[in-house]
A protein has these predicted regions:
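Short domain-boundary/entry signatures in modular proteins, especially
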Residues: 14-24
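Acidic, S/T/G-rich, low-cysteine, solvent-exposed domains in lumenal/extracellular/periplasmic regions
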Residues: 199-200
Length: 200
């Protein structure tokens, strides 16, 4: 705040970091998980083991061990996740994000019951850990998203995104995307769901 006491992003980040200081931490090998104290008792049993499983599978498949530690932060308030990720509240539609060695995501409390499943979101973001590190952060978005969605489907049959009908209709109407158009489609709210499916 030394330069601008009214900078909204700085204010948001400092406020969020104050709440993040109260989170509890679990360290398991190359993985560090930060959880809200109110969720620790339940989520500690699931988050670390699922992350370990995903990274073991990916490391074997891609013949690459990601540099760690890998930090996973789960937020019970979506706006805290958004501020931690981009500095501002909102981020409508986003459930998780990855920066190579840092994964942020909504916890189950951040959404209405039954609205989303945190496990495929974590699996998806850990897929990004692999692609971002393997490419030294130089992978096109369509490719990293495509690999993560593909890996979600392999992680559990229940996790696959439903997109066959939407894709078939777009394809039948000549509205599917070419490889050249795919990256830009991730910036278009009307095309992003189809872009995730096509990329996978």
């Amino acid at each position: 705040f030394a330069i601008d006491k009214f900078d909204q992003t700085t204010f948001n980040l400092l406020t969020m970091l104050d709440s993040l200081d109260k989170f509890q931490t679990i360290a398991d090998g190359n993985i560090i998980v930060k959880l809200h104290p109110g969720e620790m008792a339940v989520m500690r049993e699931y988050v670390g083991p699922l992350a370990q499983q995903a990274l073991e599978i990916f490391s074997k498949k891609y013949e690459f061990t990601p540099k760690g530690p890998i930090l996973i932060e789960m937020f019970p308030k979506h706006d805290d996740f958004a501020v931690r990720t981009v500095g501002l509240p909102g981020m409508i539609g986003a459930l998780g994000a990855c920066f190579g060695r840092v994964v942020t995501l909504d916890s189950p409390k951040a959404r209405p019951p039954g609205d989303f499943n945190w496990a495929p979101t974590l699996w998806h973001e850990l897929g990004h850990v692999m692609t971002l590190q393997l490419s030294k952060q130089r992978v096109p978005r369509w490719l990293t998203e495509g690999i993560s969605v593909y890996e979600e489907k392999l992680g559990s049959p229940a996790w696959g995104r439903e997109g066959e009908l939407t894709f078939a209709m777009a394809y039948g109407q000549g509205e599917h995307m070419s490889l050249r158009e795919l990256n830009a489609a991730f910036q278009d709210p009307e095309k992003i769901s189809l872009a995730y499916y096509e990329a996978s």
